């Protein structure tokens, strides 16, 4: 028996090697992971206490509606609880949107390169995918995306800041785009890296929800909040959009400890502010290192940098892996001669900067680059 045709040939997600496997394979004592854009400072100390306190309740099913977390998020964003869509990470919210609004008779518009889950989930639903190449500076080509919208377009995806290059759109650009998109087409603005943004005119997207009924804003606890291992994400939309999606959401899609941890993380605003400040300092340090060596670094508003090395990304990835640094090759991200590097903590970044010149020089010598 064959699966439905749109998923035949789809490759499964390929996770990176665990740190312990890398140590064993290459005989390393220390391995620094700078690949998945996790928070190198972990989560708020309040999270560990909340999880410990909640561990005795794991025999219970979680609150399937996530009532306490909804109330806290609604208060934070000044929206109604009914405007929230809770997901097992924003990956699930993306899946729910595609399942709810896309069919083989419809199409969806997205930038490329961008976050891969938009295309994957749209493909599974059989929708036609219209990919619009980003501009040379890495930003979304909103004019071209607008031109691609037709009567059958149901979702337009705007990853802001964009993953994998970190480039962000300003509020004026986004509002001009939203003004032109028909209300029959959702505009999903994925703000996974919102807490790291320093751009002065970055959109206050949640505040735009009342003016633009087609707008959906995505946020996550996986990045700055340091809860990647617990999988909590959410969407904010008009009540009617959230109402239509709710029946598609699996019951108990967030576990009981995830709810508890997210609540604790949300309350510790000082921790998030400190992480943002340290990320800014360390990002500037890594950027200066790469630029001093003549490499182009995309202007990132996130906790990662996309760096054009001029060497095939898989080759650079392998060389650093053998020396104890797990990076992300740009070859699978749409940037074949780039690497994406997550911003580590001070010690991790200093270790990288100390070792990287030797690795890069050896690579260039071996390739005659």
Curated annotation (Swiss-Prot):
Disulfide bonds: none annotated. It is an enzyme of class 2 (transferase). It catalyses: L-histidinol phosphate + 2-oxoglutarate = 3-(imidazol-4-yl)-2-oxopropyl phosphate + L-glutamate. Pathway: Amino-acid biosynthesis; L-histidine biosynthesis; L-histidine from 5-phospho-alpha-D-ribose 1-diphosphate: step 7/9. The keyword Protein transport does not apply. Its EC number is 2.6.1.9. The modification N6-(pyridoxal phosphate)lysine is found at residue 223. Its cofactor is pyridoxal 5'-phosphate. One of its GO terms (biological process) is L-histidine biosynthetic process. Pfam families: Aminotran_1_2. Belongs to the class-II pyridoxal-phosphate-dependent aminotransferase family. Histidinol-phosphate aminotransferase subfamily. HAMAP family: HisC_aminotrans_2 (MF_01023). Homodimer. This is Histidinol-phosphate aminotransferase. The lineage of its organism: Bacteria, Bacillati, Bacillota, Bacilli, Bacillales. The gene is hisC.
